[in-house]
Amino acid sequence: MFFEGDQAKHLFELVEGVLRIFKIMADGRRVITGFLYPGDLVGVSLRNRYVYSAEAVTPVRLRRFSRKAFEDTVGSSPELRLQLLAYLSDEMAAAQDQMVLLSCKNAEERLCSFLLQRLQRKQEQDRSCSVVDLPMSRLDIADYLGLTIETVSRTMTKLTNKGIVSPVGRHSIRILKATMLSHLAGDGDECDDGHPSVISLDKARRRH
């Protein structure tokens, strides 16, 4: 879609599909800072250039807006200004959550938190349905969590051996003990185990 440093002439609303947003470090390493889903805005910046890169994880459909037209519209609508403020507040909260995850949690806690975020996002839409799509690759997950692919795979195997998750086919994982997963994530008992959960690994709070 665009690269960090490109002139920010447009912003976008994601209509369909999943995007990853990322930054490239001076040494060439990629750091994924979030995943975006339908309804999210992409490329919102108070600067004249994009502050991150964005690319598709799956085929996507986007609604494109001229930055100037968007700013003019928001400037003339108190309601839209409040909505934009709420969006930016959510972005800040998500960034703070990610800082906590990377600075305070070990590998197991990070992966458990990642799985819980996907589960909770799906259950916000339909509490009775526990199937969520994760199109991002293991490398994407590793780059988002600040881990190596090997650590992600090893930790997933550990959770499987503990009976907390169970592979379902080639690209799915069933969460058998959501409360235990929440405990291992260091988040407390935020989920109930009433509904076993299936998380698909081959199809992909905001930016999670």
Where do the language-model regions lie?
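Polybasic "coupling" helices that flank or enter modular domains
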Residues: 75-148
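Phosphate-/nucleic-acid-contacting segments
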Residues: 120-208
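Cyclic-nucleotide recognition modules
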Residues: 32-93, 97
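Regulatory nucleotide-sensing modules
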Residues: 1-12, 16
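Cytochrome P450 core scaffold surrounding the K-helix E-X-X-R motif
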Residues: 21-25
